[in-house]
Amino acid sequence: MPSDAGPVLTAQPGRETAQPGPKAAQRGPGAARPVRAILLPSYAWNPYQRLLAAALREQGVEAAVVSEWPERSPLMGAWQAHGKPDVVHLHWIHDFLGGSKGRPSRRNVLWFDWQLRLLKSRGARIVWTVHNLKGHEAGDDPREADAHRALIERADAIILHCHRAREALIELYRPSGAAQARMHVLAHGSYVRQYDVDADAASAREALGLSRAGTVFAFVGAIRGYKGVGELLEAFTASGDLGPDARLLICGKPLPARIGRELEEHAAADPRIVLRLERIPEEDLSRVLRAADVVVLPFRDILTSGSAILALSHGRPVVVPALGCLPETLPADAAIFYDPDDPDALAGALHRAAGADLAAMGARARAWADGLDWGPIAAETARLYRGD
């Protein structure tokens, strides 16, 4: 790393990281109470915050995940409703800028920044984990960019999941040197303990009406434009022979609905493509992933991918573009990377997967995921909460 990179804290598998005991997260020597923190927003479909909060509690932090907040004053309202905790740990901020109502207004952004100022004036520490550089559908919206710049400058600590993310954040938003010094790189934990990652693969295929023979390529998750599912169908169809009984399984809810209609039109011409265009209940997610031999995530744009870590946690190798944090953080012996700027590269990656020992890659994927324990990550996060 360059000398101006600022502090970088790592909590990576195989590296020793100090893990404080139950009282280590308390506020100073002999403190009467532990640090209290809220993590928001929390969504039912994403266990990231719940897993982190559970690990933080083991470190002595009183951590609560927040899934509801007052519309008019989300940050201040959530902080007050949870007893004015010491730390407000933000993740995605779209819902605090107007959410589904469209792009944020100047008033939304100013109010968001004012709430950050108010929280800090009341003694709260602001922590931000950067999952995306900007909203997936935000484009080059200058007002959303202003909100991110405000958060970067106000935050007491900024957590990123790879060094490339740190570099990209600096390139995009040009933060002050002081803000750069508050950026820290921590690992992204796995989902091994959250799901039935050892679900029987043969039974999973039977439940989905898939033959036990042949390679099953799968995409799993919400189907949005930036995820490139249309390009995946085109690459699969153009790839020709991917082995006897090869199938492409697409599972997830299209957003917006027109994407689903486009996929149905394409799939109608290729009987090897199986569509399940609906939201996958959490209890069925493991079955879908275990039915696959390899999970394909053809993002057009991405920083970090919980979906990739989810697949690897289920012992399934991934096919992904060499974008964002993926080349730096995913295991090279359990992932097949391709050049997103080469229009033929995805089809080539599918052929490479078809010829690979996917079972061996899957075993390596699971071993890697087993090493991504939330404990060391929570220990470092608690340290940032304390401001050590």
Positions of PLM-derived features:
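Donor nucleotide-sugar binding/catalytic pocket of nucleotide-sugar-dependent glycosyltransferases
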Residues: 153-196
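Conserved donor-binding/catalytic core segment of Leloir-type glycosyltransferases
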Residues: 211-227, 233-236, 249
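Nucleotide-activated donor-binding/catalytic signature segment of Leloir-type glycosyltransferases, i.e.
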Residues: 260-286
